[in-house]
A protein has these predicted regions:
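Cysteine endopeptidase catalytic domains of the caspase/legumain-like
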Residues: 1-292
């Protein structure tokens, strides 16, 4: 743990994606006749990032196949329940690798979701290392995620935003093809450790109830697979639809199948309907890797 160092902010990673996304979305808001699709939104982000000298390629991952040629949303149009959000911005004030734009990211994204998507301040939890909000420690971040999904019900839409450093740690569970877990780096990472993708998956992703929607924006290094989801769209200018991620761990899919069955209270047919397409692709890809 002590050997991990925050990356040099000159690496031009912190906050770039949030800014690019908001630029694209506010441009669309100012031209209401032009509804952006997921593809247009992510490719618009990529163009803005490249124009500013950034190398990131925006990605969308999902627990199910999403038609990326449909309109982009943070809260789905059919949302009938409560809209909640957890927004985290860490500048690592006073530490090596200090960032400067993550607090602004949170303030800007908060204004956007309230102004455009109808989120109410009372349902927005903010964690920032500014001395005014709840400190973004490891414990506080995980608690915020756990509280968010604990309160979610059918018809609700929740949004999580993280702007800060991301990292990698050696995988100890054997579920990562590249041998590394992607991580979020909390303020107290030296004392408490980083937050692994497995932690996020277990406390956040698997706890979302049936009929509710969770959308996350992770603006940090190594964030492409930090939620450990099976479907992926990469805005590289060549893809036009979401694909099954062949690096996805088959065990996670089995867990999702079990979760679906639990949600439907033993209704195996309903559970199978949720995961059958994913299972078919996952098993095929997994067998190809195992027996090639």
């Amino acid at each position: 743990m002590a050997s991990f160092q925050l990356p040099d902010p000159a690496g031009r990673a912190g906050g770039a994606c949030t800014s690019a996304l908001l630029n694209a979305l506010y441009a669309e808001k100012n031209a209401p006749s032009k509804d952006l699709t997921w593809v247009e939104t992510l490719e618009g982000m990529r163009k803005m990032l490249r124009a500013k000298g950034y190398e990131q390629i925006p990605q969308l991952t999902s627990s199910r196949m999403v038609d990326v040629n449909q309109n982009f949303y943070i809260a789905p149009p059919n949302c009938t329940g409560t809209r909640r959000a957890v927004l985290i911005g860490i500048n690592y004030v006073g530490q090596q690798g200090q960032l400067s734009g993550c607090h602004n990211d949170v303030n800007n994204i908060k204004e956007y979701i309230m102004d455009v998507h109808g989120f109410e301040e009372k349902n927005i939890t903010v964690l920032m290392d500014d001395g005014k909000h709840t400190s973004p420690t490891r414990q506080n971040i995980l608690h915020a995620y756990e509280t968010l999904v604990k309160n979610m019900k059918r018809g609700d839409a929740s949004f999580c935003h993280y702007s800060g450093h991301g990292g990698k740690l050696s995988d100890t569970s054997g579920d990562e093809e590249d041998g590394f877990d992607e991580t979020l780096v909390p303020l107290d990472y030296v004392q408490a450790g980083q937050i692994k993708d497995d932690d996020i998956y277990n406390c956040l992703v698997t706890k979302v109830p049936e009929g509710a929607t969770l959308t996350c924006l992770m603006d940090c290094c190594h964030s492409g697979t930090v939620l450990d989801l099976p479907f992926k769209f990469v805005a590289d200018g060549q893809s036009s639809e979401m694909q099954f991620d062949e690096a996805f761990d088959i065990a996670h899919l089995i867990n999702l199948a079990g979760l679906a069955q639990a949600i439907f209270k033993g209704d195996k047919a309903a559970a199978i309907d949720i995961v059958k397409d994913a299972a078919k692709d996952a098993v095929t890809g997994w067998l190809k890797k195992k027996f090639k």
